[in-house]
Amino acid sequence: MSTPTHNLPRTRVSAFCWVALERSTRIERPTSWSWKELSHYSLIVFHCIPDTTPKQIEECFKKFLRRPDIVIILINQVYADMIRPTVDAHNLAVPTVLEIPSKQHPYDSSRDSILKRAQRVITPPERHY
C-alpha cells in the first residue's frame, strides 16, 4: 500500500464531481491523491477510519472550508459531532456542509447544524411585553 501524499494520514478522501454523479460514476483515491488532482471537483465527501482523531478530522474539514473550488461538503453526523463547534461555527452558504447518516449510527435531526439554522429562520423570536 502506498503512502498518502497529503498530510492527514488517517483520512480517506472520496471526491465526486457533478458529471460523475450524473453518470453514477464514483472517482475514489483512498490511498494516494493530491490537492491538485482534486482541484476540478466541486463536491467533497470524506470518510474517516475508526482511529482518526477529532483533531485530524477538524484539520481536514478546515482545509476543505478554505478551498474556493469546493461548494458542498458531505460529512457523516458521527464525525460532525466530533468537531461540532467547528461545524456549527461555519455559517457561510458556500461551501454548504451537509450532515448525512452513517450506516453504523442513527441520524439525529436535533444535532444537524442546517436544521438548527432553518429552525431559527422559521421560528419567530419571542416577544417580551
From Swiss-Prot:
The keyword Transport applies. It comes from Drosophila melanogaster (Fruit fly). GO terms for molecular function: proton-transporting ATPase activity, rotational mechanism. This is V-type proton ATPase subunit F 2. The lineage of its organism: Eukaryota, Metazoa, Ecdysozoa, Arthropoda, Hexapoda. V-ATPase is a heteromultimeric enzyme made up of two complexes: the ATP-hydrolytic V1 complex and the proton translocation V0 complex. The V1 complex consists of three catalytic AB heterodimers that form a heterohexamer, three peripheral stalks each consisting of EG heterodimers, one central rotor including subunits D and F, and the regulatory subunits C and H. The proton translocation complex V0 consists of the proton transport subunit a, a ring of proteolipid subunits c9c'', rotary subunit d, subunits e and f, and the accessory subunits VhaAC45 and ATP6AP2. Pfam families: ATP-synt_F (PF01990). Belongs to the V-ATPase F subunit family. GO terms for biological process: proton transmembrane transport. It comes from the Eukaryota. The keyword Transport applies. One of its GO terms (cellular component) is proton-transporting V-type ATPase complex.
